[in-house]
């Protein structure tokens, strides 16, 4: 199996960065997913990973590429995990320092509501009452607000801390719970001045999809980078507060740093 993996990985040499290749290698070796499935996985990376595709995605970006450290990219993952210029990052963090909660990532808001009715989180794969019971296991109750955020492929995929506080836990959620179908799920739990805040990171089902830049018991400031998706499409923020004071609107596009409360 290991020989097959290495042979297939050679086919994407120079297509994805070394760190990404190693992450995928580690995953497929641990999962024993089989030769044919592995081949499909690699071919999927190859098909997505073309210079023309990158150029198309750049044109689709709603924000200026001048915000980023690089405007030209060697491969798709180089584009997908691009970093903001330090001056732009500092500007966003400075504008957010007196805010309670911010948008943690570039997104379109799919839904906003209260956990007493999560039916508008449109990609939940289980009945709402069952999802609530699952989330109660990690400390979420039906008095929380939620913001459900969609990340498109052209978007900036670094994720930043939506609040200032202490990282209480980084929880991988078993796919057996199937909150988001077979997709992977991490929950970041914060202790803050406004109570516990939860950030759900929903990734692609077949790959190791999130690299953390934080650890449990670490104190973070609002806007700090907490990690990046290697492949992912959804985040959900859960927090308490006056629902009527939430500043963002459903179906609108937002960049990281926009004020929620």
Identify the role of each PLM range.
Residues 1-261:
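Contiguous, well-folded functional domains in the mature portion of proteins
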């Amino acid at each position: 199996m290991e020989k097959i993996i290495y042979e297939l990985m050679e086919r994407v040499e120079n297509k994805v960065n070394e760190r990404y290749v190693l992450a995928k290698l580690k995953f497929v070796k641990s999962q024993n997913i089989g030769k044919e499935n592995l081949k499909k996985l690699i071919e999927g990376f190859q098909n997505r990973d073309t210079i023309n595709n990158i150029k198309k995605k750049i044109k689709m970006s709603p924000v200026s590429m001048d915000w980023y450290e690089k405007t030209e990219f060697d491969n798709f993952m180089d584009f997908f995990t691009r970093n903001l210029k330090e001056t732009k990052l500092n500007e966003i963090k400075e504008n957010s320092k007196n805010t309670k909660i911010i948008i943690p990532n570039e997104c379109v808001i799919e839904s906003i509501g209260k956990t007493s009715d999560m039916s508008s989180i449109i990609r939940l794969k289980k009945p709402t009452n069952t999802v609530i019971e699952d989330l109660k296991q990690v400390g979420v109750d039906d008095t929380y607000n939620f913001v459900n955020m969609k990340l498109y492929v052209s978007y900036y995929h670094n994720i930043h801390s939506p609040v200032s506080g202490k990282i209480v836990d980084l929880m991988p959620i078993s796919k057996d719970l199937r909150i988001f179908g077979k997709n992977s799920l991490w929950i970041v739990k914060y202790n803050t001045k406004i109570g516990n805040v939860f950030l759900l990171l929903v990734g692609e089902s077949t790959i190791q999809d999130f690299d953390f830049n934080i650890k449990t018991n670490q104190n973070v400031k609002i806007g700090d980078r907490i990690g990046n998706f290697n492949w992912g499409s959804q985040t959900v923020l859960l927090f308490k507060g006056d629902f009527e004071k939430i500043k963002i609107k459903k179906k609108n596009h937002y960049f990281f740093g926009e004020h929620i409360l």
